[in-house]
Amino acid sequence: PEQGAGVIALKVPGVQATDEQRRYYPAAEVTAHIVGFTDIDETGQEGLELAYNDWLSGQPGKRRTLKDRKGRLARQAELIESASPGKELMLSIDLRLQYMAYRELRQAVEKHRASAGSLVMLDVKTGEVLAMVNQPVYNPNNRSDMQAYKMRNRVLTDMVEPGSTLKPFTVAAALESGQFQKNSVINTSPGIMRLGRDKVKDIRNYGSIDITTVLRKSSNIGVSKMALTIGPDKVMDLLQRVGLGQSTGTGFPGESAGYLPFRDRWSDIEIATLSFGYGLTVTPLQLAQAYTVLGSGGILRPVSLIKRDVIPDGIRVLDQRIANDLRNMLREVVHGGTGGRAQIDAFEVGGKTGTARKVGENGYSKDRYIGMFAGLAPINDPRLAIVVVIDDPTGQAYYGGLTAAPVFSNVAAGALRLLGVEPAGNAVSSTSSTSSTSSTSSSIAYVPWRLPLEEKFMGPILAPELNSVQNIALKKG
């Protein structure tokens, strides 16, 4: 700008200044994967800028004029078509939660030296996306840093095998079949199950365990035996009903539908591996939407990145009692199971860890993994469904319970406090769509969580604004 002003000050004949508007993104990389960016002509190229380009751009008007052969105006301009300005677009994203999720995910990816990471947070009550972040990122205000691998919105575009995060849905299908009850006992001895030439293994021999323990210990043999008993069709039917294998309907450019394997004939090992999340792929957003079904008592609602004026009723895809039973089981996974690091102070949460082997050129890798955690908070009356993916951690820890669960814990704790959600009873009723109304023990301390805002990431314009919003939220709490 200083150089430009200096040139204009020279008053060189034929040189003049023209004002041009350019998009500036105050949240920069924090919302880059959602908002996207425009080109030099202000045409959307990525993200919601592309998806809603016509809505945001409006339409230019038209005027007709008549000039003589010397270019002089012979008739006043006549309006042919009025211009229509672009319309506003209100996103469902809560910028406080978005920043917090961005910060926690970035720190986890750096800590575990992972190649990438994703986190998505859905409002269980509405289906709205409250936060959606990825690593690595790019800054839309710095076009020189736009590399393809940084620009991908992995929450919607990247498909992963869900691993053990899928096990709750295998259990749901088993309960739905009537062939298993929540107190059914499954013999997993001796910790290895042979299926022809293949084997299914648990980490250790858990012996005879009930279904809750199958999830708490993440027993591959337990869910395999359930799936083999009820057959793959019942499992596949449930997976389709909760939204897997199909687009979530956000309208986001490049969203993947995932993959569900439909076969005329299934081998035993194919049924077994399906039961614990191999042989199919999902996006993190699809997985989060599926978990909202458990959180809402069996109701599936479409996902939206746009703020909703009217909350859709959704459709019932799972019996309410089964959904609530699963929530109680997921609570046990966090309390005494593989998801212990997902716990948060003052709130009860539930969820499932997952650790899937990455696929390489020669099949499944022996030393490369994807760590995941999918959960609900608070578990008694879920408000949030959160999925965390840590891709290819190269540090000492790679299990989802060690890499992704702590991120869930930090993000869920901050989000519940910022949203003003009060701690409540912990038990989930099997027959009620709402939580137990018993109050929390007075021994549990409820400490308001404060969002650390850094100008370094949010920019000098936005950080103070968010601080003031946060202060209001804390005062209300």
Predicted regions and their residues:
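Short, small/polar residue-rich loop motifs at catalytic or cofactor-binding pockets
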Residues: P60, R113-A116, N187
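Beta-lactam-recognizing serine transpeptidase/beta-lactamase-like catalytic domain environment
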Residues: K67-E78, L119, D123-S164, F169-T394, ...
